[in-house]
Amino acid sequence: MSLWSSVKFAQRYAQLPKVFYRLVTPQPLDNNRWVIWNGELAQGFALPKHADDPQLLSVFSGAEPFSAFKPLAMKYAGHQFGVYNPDLGDGRGLLLGEMQNQQGQWFDIHLKGAGLTPFSRMGDGRAVLRSTLREYLCSEAMAALGIETTRALGMMVSDTPVYREQVEQGACLIRLAQTHIRFGHFEHFFYTEQYDELRLLADNVIEWYMPECTAHDKPYLAMFEQVVARTATMIAQWQAVGFAHGVMNTDNMSILGQTFDYGPFGFLDDYEPGYICNHSDYQGRYAFDQQPRVALWNLSALAHALSPLIERDDLELALAQYEPTLGKVFSQLMRQKLGLLSQQEGDSELFNAMFALLAENHTDYTRFFRTLSQLDREDEQTVIDLFIDRDAAHGWLSRYLERVAMEQTASGEAKSAQQRCEQMRAVNPKYILRNYLAQQAIDKAQQGDFSEVHTLAKLLKNPYDEQAEMEAYAHLPPEWGKKMVISCSS
């Protein structure tokens, strides 16, 4: 029985006119070998759990031609740090084709680090071990946290030298995503006045990903409304979990509201609203607390690109739904994190007082919520001890517990502290991919030891579980590991 006999492939994007892409032959790395294969994800596509068959490596690395694949580099544009750049496209990654999972959903197969393309500009078309490991681990960590994201099927390392600030090992990532269509795809066709192609792109987005929009009187408007809602939801999830993307250019924004293009990202350690994780972000444009604003800016840029298809008034009305949607979803997530069942007057003030307290005391964001989730097992003092200003912490905690008691009294189904805390532990992770943990795995991997990569990958699949034997990974970061800023070079 063939390795591929049960796998369903397609090449829908390759059926579009040639102006949408360029066909490119992958340039395999030297002595490619697996670092990690995501067996659980692979099984969902009828692929084997273990990557023992050498054909898996040769096909997914691009070393062996495969009839189901038609490798191509997409053309797009985008606003980078607010400045329009028309000269973008897949500069080091290739869309190989699509696979269908067992739920009937199609996923793009994208090989990142596949070599030069017509859109490589001054680059070499390669990805390095360091950044590839970070993307693999973070995309899978985000999926386990329940946040919309691209996925990682596997990654490889090679003997090919890649020249960045220093010589590094070349690597490749097999990224799966429901689409690789970005805001920047629409911007490219708009700014080059290729309006027929703009319409064709919108038609295919609707057909492939949002077929329900066809029943709408204004299907293009319905499509944009979905993009707005999905983006608002994604940003609310980022802010709730403490995730900073680092480089929210419009070419890094998925039209399906999925976290996309992991680069200089970071999870909050101490709660610092203005946290900047990208060392190239000198102005703090993409700081943690700016992400909601930037996403709206990006949606406005997309709206401008869609103006040949959608009336201006309709675009403005759709954009006006972004902030209410973001606020509603974020408040729901905060109530879940605090174990509150219902919405009550004064909740916003409670949240704002909490954020102010966390910021003033430089309290670890993830540990605070996880400790609050342990109040059925621990004394209140364990929460208060997280803060420098213990009196202020005691005051907020008393207010919070009054809010919990008031809800239980007012509601018909009062929950016990144990029930409430169990529900809180299911939404407040114990383990996140702190930058220092990723760096420790990278340091070992660069010496040829991938054990820490596998340890982290296993740990982060179940971020809400106690995993007592892994307790050290929940510790606060050492001083050198706090507020790490990451390079965009990958």
UniProtKB/Swiss-Prot annotation:
The keyword Manganese applies. It is an enzyme of class 2 (transferase). It catalyses: L-seryl-[protein] + ATP = 3-O-(5'-adenylyl)-L-seryl-[protein] + diphosphate; L-threonyl-[protein] + ATP = 3-O-(5'-adenylyl)-L-threonyl-[protein] + diphosphate; L-tyrosyl-[protein] + ATP = O-(5'-adenylyl)-L-tyrosyl-[protein] + diphosphate; L-histidyl-[protein] + UTP = N(tele)-(5'-uridylyl)-L-histidyl-[protein] + diphosphate. Keywords: ATP-binding, Magnesium, Manganese, Metal-binding, Nucleotide-binding, Nucleotidyltransferase, Transferase. Its EC number is 2.7.7.-, 2.7.7.108. ATP binds at G89, G91, R92, K112, D124, G125, R175, R182, D261. It comes from the Bacteria. Coiled coil: none annotated. InterPro entries: SelO. Its cofactor is Mg(2+); Mn(2+). Signal peptide: none annotated. Mg(2+) binds at N252, D261. GO terms for molecular function: AMPylase activity; ATP binding; magnesium ion binding. Disulfide bonds: none annotated. The active site is at D251. Nucleotidyltransferase involved in the post-translational modification of proteins. It can catalyze the addition of adenosine monophosphate (AMP) or uridine monophosphate (UMP) to a protein, resulting in modifications known as AMPylation and UMPylation. NCBIfam families: PRK00029.1 (NF000658). Belongs to the SELO family. This is Protein nucleotidyltransferase YdiU. It comes from Vibrio vulnificus (strain CMCP6).
